[in-house]
Amino acid sequence: MAALTRNPQFQKLQQWHREHGSELNLRHLFDTDKERFNHFSLTLNTNHGHILLDYSKNLVTEEVMHMLLDLAKSRGVEAARESMFNGEKINSTEDRAVLHVALRNRSNTPIVVDGKDVMPEVNKVLDKMKAFCQRVRSGDWKGYTGKTITDVINIGIGGSDLGPLMVTEALKPYSSGGPRVWFVSNIDGTHIAKTLACLNPESSLFIIASKTFTTQETITNAETAKDWFLLSAKDPSTVAKHFVALSTNTAKVKEFGIDPQNMFEFWDWVGGRYSLWSAIGLSIALHVGFDNFEQLLSGAHWMDQHFRTTPLEKNAPVLLAMLGIWYINCFGCETQAVLPYDQYLHRFAAYFQQGDMESNGKYITKSGARVDHQTGPIVWGEPGTNGQHAFYQLIHQGTKMIPCDFLIPVQTQHPIRKGLHHKILLANFLAQTEALMKGKSTEEARKELQAAGKSPEDLMKLLPHKVFEGNRPTNSIVFTKLTPFILGALIAMYEHKIFVQGVVWDINSFDQWGVELGKQLAKKIEPELDGSSPVTSHDSSTNGLINFIKQQREAKIQ
């Protein structure tokens, strides 16, 4: 594929931006088109609630949207989409298919990889997960002293941690009757020490999530958990009642002491950051029940069908993706804020921080050339209204344009005080996107200060600080209620957005070579930390850091 910057549609878009971009004014766009909301919004109607995507508060016109969609077509988004759904090996650097969509393919239509339909294997693992969940949640599965399981501890990192953690937090209202869940990811001993201190080995079940069963952080934490467990249980044969594996390495799993019958497999066409739909989601299913896990899959499958079959101009993931391209590649925006106004979604931004930045944080194209344009943004965010009292100042009056996605459910899980809390939350959600769009003019600020009785001197002093330029772009994503189905749909929507942007940039969104170099160097440095002899084999900075650590290791602190 030709470089993006040589694409005629992209050049046309850039030319338009150079000539007209600075003239785009959201207040003016709304004033001159009273139907702007209807022209630039999309409602997705499902049998399990509705999702409204309002993108009218973006710096776009109908002409710009046409150019963005023409660009998507010219970059082969539709063909690439079919290649993914058809099981072609679109992960070119690892020669793998990319089929998280198969994991939630509720229609069971065949999906073929290397001449073999993968759906029977997918369904076999789902059936095994279902039976296991029923045994644990019903109390049929007993620990070594005959106690039922009260706590499930997922030990994994990256995609084996972030997805299940985010979803179990988001679906906490649906966890009645399930065990508590804990997540240990960090190699920092504090993480597992703090977790184990809260647990009873007799009623704890550990899920070790590692495809290869060799991931350093995960296996180190798993061995620590096993040692802690055996301090009480004594008998190594009891490990089989308290440890299960999500892996493909039967030999290593067996060597650890886990019964291979309690190993849940997944496949090389499941990328870590897209794996919560697979056996990696076992902690989700245990916590909220398998029926709710299936609803999560169904919501994602609904969005898969929307993404695959809907024309681009009405396609939610495509619209989100191309708006992102507009801001990143024409306006020079470097970050994207994800701001869920729902406390249960407090890990949503962190989840897509990995999903987006590990997927599209690349400067090499599929053909091996270096890009001459920006690619993936820095993704960040916190739940509303907390963020309003932290970083919204910079979004409103800072020098950087930060496109924002605001998300909120219409119905709350907790209508306390007759819904007062949620009404205040909704009001803040609505106010923020309006404020970012409209801002506050000099004249409006002046009238406000005059009404407050400010003297002419104070007025002139405060006036420039009270002005808001506005014209800050936002998407509003409003959904009926945060249910397993709707959550599945929202996650899939963002997954496909990331995919579309990767296609436009001609990068492989499904490898992650950038995480390897640090791991390689860490293996070299680890033995150098032993002993007290100074290290001289690195650059002066790394040598200095290692030697300071060695000096301070035994330092006495008062």
Curated annotation (Swiss-Prot):
Catalytic activity: alpha-D-glucose 6-phosphate = beta-D-fructose 6-phosphate
Pathway assignment: Carbohydrate degradation; glycolysis; D-glyceraldehyde 3-phosphate and glycerone phosphate from D-glucose: step 2/4
Pfam families listed in its UniProt record: PGI
N6-(2-hydroxyisobutyryl)lysine carried by residues: K34
Predominant location category: cytoplasm
Keyword terms of this UniProt record: Acetylation, Cytokine, Cytoplasm, Gluconeogenesis, Glycolysis, Hydroxylation, Isomerase, Phosphoprotein, Secreted, Ubl conjugation
PTM info: Phosphorylation at Ser-185 by CK2 has been shown to decrease enzymatic activity and may contribute to secretion by a non-classical secretory pathway.
Modified residues (N6-malonyllysine): K454
Biological process annotations from GO: gluconeogenesis; glucose 6-phosphate metabolic process; glycolytic process
Keyword Secreted: yes
Residues that bear N6-succinyllysine: K454
Record bears the keyword Isomerase: yes
Active site residues per record: E358 (proton donor), H389, K519
EC number: 5.3.1.9
Residue(s) carrying N6-acetyllysine: K12, K142, K454
Oligomer and partners: Homodimer in the catalytically active form, monomer in the secreted form.
Role noted for this protein: In the cytoplasm, catalyzes the conversion of glucose-6-phosphate to fructose-6-phosphate, the second step in glycolysis, and the reverse reaction during gluconeogenesis. Besides it's role as a glycolytic enzyme, also acts as a secreted cytokine: acts as an angiogenic factor (AMF) that stimulates endothelial cell motility. Acts as a neurotrophic factor, neuroleukin, for spinal and sensory neurons. It is secreted by lectin-stimulated T-cells and induces immunoglobulin secretion.
Protein name: Glucose-6-phosphate isomerase
Record organism: Oryctolagus cuniculus
